[in-house]
């Protein structure tokens, strides 16, 4: 349990770097823009672009640290598996559903995916040597959440990478939140 918590605590720091305060910022600013579809789509694309960039930076830092610290590099497969959760949390853009207050979908999705995760744990994780299996099963709900969000969010807008000068404005606003 101690080793598992160690890995998860390290990953949580990189998740914070990837988030960069974006969910809080996106919900607070996006809620006021959601009625103007064109304006909101542009805003969502810009914030999503920042989210992808911060995730890239976070995963790159994780890769450098895992490569430099010998005890981390011995367990590189675990770090790769756990970094998938960072990537899919970004791709899922949960903040978009929060902007539109679609809590019913979020709740149902959460319940079904977590039940599936618990069932998988009971089926595949038998003892303390199954740590890699545990981490894979730990990441599966993140992947399913990200994919289901991505499919469901299309009813609100189609997120895409958009690089323009407005990103600098959002970046300045995000630093105090981060």
What are these regions (language model features)?
Residues 9-12, 55, 86, 113-118, ...:
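Residue-level recognition of pore/gate-forming positions within transmembrane alpha-helices
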Residues 76, 87-108:
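Membrane-interface junctions at transmembrane-helix termini in multi-pass inner-membrane proteins
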Residues 6-9, 45-52, 80, 108-112, ...:
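Internal alpha-helical transmembrane segments of multi-pass membrane proteins, especially GPCRs
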Residues 104-108, 131-138, 147-178:
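Interhelical loop/hinge segments that connect adjacent transmembrane helices in multipass membrane
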Residues 18-35:
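Helix-loop junctions and terminal segments of transmembrane helices
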Residues 61-63, 108-131, 148-149:
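Alpha-helical transmembrane segments of multi-pass membrane transporters
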Residues 1-6, 33-45, 56-87, 127-135:
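Membrane-interface helix-capping segments at transmembrane helix termini in multi-pass transporters
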Residues 2-19, 143, 178:
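Alpha-helical transmembrane segments of polytopic membrane transporters and translocases
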């Amino acid at each position: 349990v101690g080793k598992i918590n160690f890995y998860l605590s390290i990953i949580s720091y990189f998740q914070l770097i990837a988030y960069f305060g974006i969910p809080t910022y996106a919900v607070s600013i996006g809620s006021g823009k959601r009625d103007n579809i064109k304006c909101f789509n542009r805003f969502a694309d810009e914030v999503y672009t920042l989210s992808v960039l911060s995730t890239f930076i976070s995963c790159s830092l994780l890769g450098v640290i895992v490569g430099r610290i010998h005890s981390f590099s011995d367990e590189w497969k675990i770090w790769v598996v756990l970094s998938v959760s960072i990537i899919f949390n970004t791709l899922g853009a949960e903040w978009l559903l929060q902007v539109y207050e679609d809590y019913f979908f979020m709740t149902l999705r959460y319940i079904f995916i977590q039940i599936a995760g618990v069932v998988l744990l009971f089926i595949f994780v038998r003892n303390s040597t199954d740590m890699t299996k545990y981490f894979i099963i730990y990441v599966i709900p993140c992947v399913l959440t990200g994919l289901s969000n991505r499919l469901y969010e299309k009813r609100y807008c189609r997120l895409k990478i958009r690089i323009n000068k407005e990103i600098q404005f959002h970046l300045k606003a995000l630093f105090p939140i981060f």
